[in-house]
Structure formats: structure tokens, C-alpha cells
């Protein structure tokens, strides 16, 4: 419907293409929330499995680190809800201010405008809007509909970011646990911190505990790798659609901002919408990048795990794990590109090119 009504005028089309793509991707996100609930719950259970709870050693407390990750995900989720909601509130307020300024009477008879001219976004009004109060009612009708849809999108984005944060936290925790494996083994055997041996094989209890701990940590790593695969399967396609859409959404938003007088209410409406869309992709790219960094540090943690005096079987198992971690963990955008900050920069650069194109044909 938007295409049929706006494609006749290139300026109008460019101005509305961002909203069109936003809601198209939003439908895919709604589909994931509705039909992927069991898979999402399975991923959450894998990332918070109590079997892989670790005690604090030295200056690192895994439980506190994980709680900090929970607090961060909560703050980001609340921020997304507030930003997405405020976009509709600000556009509603702007429309009311404009219509009350330009329309002094109770209807549009003495003007050459209709209610559609004052709508912040293209919207098919399902009832008569000849009167001013009817147009204001249409504002409420549109904003409530957009608000509900914005909350659904915020639910998806908040959930996705939370899963990325938890995966990153677990990888960081696992890296610290690998590094302190000897210290944890000594604690498990109630041995003093400064207890040392030349060869672990001379102390079978230490050798057995070290190998037991390494096997347990490696099993945790396998669980995280499986969780990564499930997250990839669940969100990879919608992330691809989101990334491709952002190429045009960013350029459309920048075009709208450039066409609006600076300081006007409409200017701040478009600016807030642009910030929302930028935050949406930036969050997942940022934590996708953090996951890759955390996984790369695991290999270094394995090397720093005080393995010189360990047994042959311990060293072989350690080498196998290090070999696996030579290939870092990363999420992809539809299997085409890694979910990193470099991708975000590439998308923004591409959108600037489209923005320049839109400017040249206005």
C-alpha cells in the first residue's frame, strides 16, 4: 500500500521507505517471538546451566561477573523500550502541534490539506477524518498501533542482545576458569595455594583432579559452541534482513533530516527515529564483536593454565582444545558476513552513499 501511494513521487517514496522496511523486518521478528519460543527457552537454559557454576578464585568472581551482565542486559532492554516508545510519542506530539498551529477551525474546508498531510507517517485511516477532532483521533489510532508494534520489535531486540551478552559473559568466565585450573584443582583437594610439584604424575590425586577439571571445562565449552549454533540458526536470517534494510533506512532517515528545518519538532522526530535504528543494529554488532574477542582470549587462557608439570593426557587434551579455538567463535549475518563492528561501519558507509544518491535526484 505504501509503495502504491508513494512511488509516484520520489521524494515521498524516499521519505517513507525507512518506515516500510522497519515494519517489514518487524514482522519477521514477531514471527521469531511467536514460533521460536521453545528454541529460545532452550538456548536460555544452556546459557544458565547450574552444572557450570564456578566459585570465585583470587580476584575474579564468576557469579558477580554474570550478574553485571544481567544488569547490563536489563538496562539495554529498558533503553530499547523507552527509545522505541518515545519515537511514537514524539511524532504524535509533533503532529498535534502542527495541526493546531495551521488549522484554526474545526475542519479542513478552508484549506487545501487533508488529515493525511499531517500524519507523521503514511497511514491508511480506516474512518472519516473531515473534522479536526477526527484527525486527532486518527493520530491516537496510529500511535497505539505503532506503539504495540514497536514494543514487539523491542522485545525481539532486547532478547537477542541479552542472549549475546550472556554468551559473551560465559566465554569470558570460561577463559578465566581455564587460566586458574591448577588453583581450582588445589582448592578442590584442600591443598594450600603455594603447593607445587615437579611432575603431576608423582601425585595421582592432583593429576586426576586436573584432568577432571579440564574435561568439565571442555564440556562447558562444547555447550557454549552449541548455544552459539542455535543462536545463529534462530537469528541469522532476520539479522541479514535487518542489515540490508538498514542500508536504506539510514539513508532514508538522513534524507528526511536533511529536508527538515533544524530545530523544528519534525527535525527531532526524525533524529530520534534515526538514533533508534542506529542503536538497534549497533547493539547486536557490538556484542557480536565482543563474543569473537572473548573466544579468541580462551586460547591464550589455555596457554597460561600452568600446564608445564601436567601429565601427557592432560597436555594432549589441552592441545586439542587449543586447536579448536584457533578458529574463533563468531555469529554471522545470513552466513555472508561476521557480526562485528566492521560490518556496522560498512553498513553506515553504504547508507551514506545511498543518501548522496537520494540528494542528487531530489
How should these model regions be labeled?
Residues 1-362:
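Membrane-embedded alpha-helical segments and the immediately adjacent membrane-proximal loops
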